[in-house]
A protein has these predicted regions:
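Hydrophobic faces of well-ordered beta-strands that scaffold small-molecule active sites
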Residues: 11-14, 59-61
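His/Asp/Glu-enriched, well-ordered alpha-helical/loop segment
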Residues: 31, 52-59, 64-140
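Active-site environment of divalent metal-dependent phosphoester hydrolases
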Residues: 1, 17-19, 66-68
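A conserved active-site cap/scaffold subdomain adjacent to cofactor or substrate pockets
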Residues: 25-56
Length: 197
């Protein structure tokens, strides 16, 4: 934890910090500008080790769907943040494939722990009486991210060109099928989250 915190990452452990490192600025430039900033491969590896040894409890992400033109102009002009939510699960599944994280740890850190940390009622688990928020993943589907599969209104992702070995096939929110075959069913909406106080 000391190495992680000494590098200025504090208590924020987002998916992009587990995936990208400073060499990626050469090709992606301002597209991966975020706060805290993407650090070195040593920092990324320290985060991955902290994740695998359970020093990190929660994996989170933000989704900042800035237009591509807002990400131009170099480090001083490009806005911070990137659209990450669509490909965040498959990016973390790569860590499972590489043996850095177990599938059980992934579920704990991405589902159970966030619900517990924020005291969210009836979420984060598959249990009677809980909302059926589920993702069906094909763990053995190799594919490459292309621009035409981006669902975010901003129309781009820093993941374009990346090869993944798992794919999200379906997503259910409150038991309703909301995503299948790279299409979102807009007729279903989420519900207001309730928090235990």
């Amino acid at each position: 934890r000391d190495l992680v915190r000494s590098r200025g990452l504090g208590d924020v452990y987002k998916r992009q910090h587990l995936y990208f490192y400073d060499k990626d600025y050469e090709t992606l430039k301002g597209r991966i500008k975020c706060n805290p900033s993407i650090k070195t491969s040593e920092d990324r590896n320290a985060l991955r080790k902290a994740l695998s040894t359970n020093l990190i409890d929660v994996i989170g992400t933000d989704h900042a769907p800035h237009l591509l033109k807002e990400k131009e102009g170099g480090a001083l002009k490009a806005v911070s943040g990137m659209p990450m939510i669509q490909f965040s699960l498959v990016a973390i599944m790569e860590l499972v494939r590489e043996g850095i994280l177990s599938i059980e740890q992934l579920v704990q850190k991405m589902c159970h722990a966030p619900a517990e940390l924020y005291h969210i009622e009836r979420r984060g688990y598959i249990r009677p009486g809980y909302q059926a928020d589920l993702v069906l993943v094909n763990p053995d589907h190799e594919w490459t991210v292309t621009a035409d599969c981006v669902l975010s209104k901003c129309g781009w992702t820093p993941m374009e060109g990346q090869k993944f070995h798992t794919r999200v096939e379906k997503t259910f929110v409150n038991g309703d099928l909301v995503y299948s075959d790279n299409k979102v069913d807009q007729s279903h909406r989420g519900q207001e989250l309730r928090f235990k106080r």
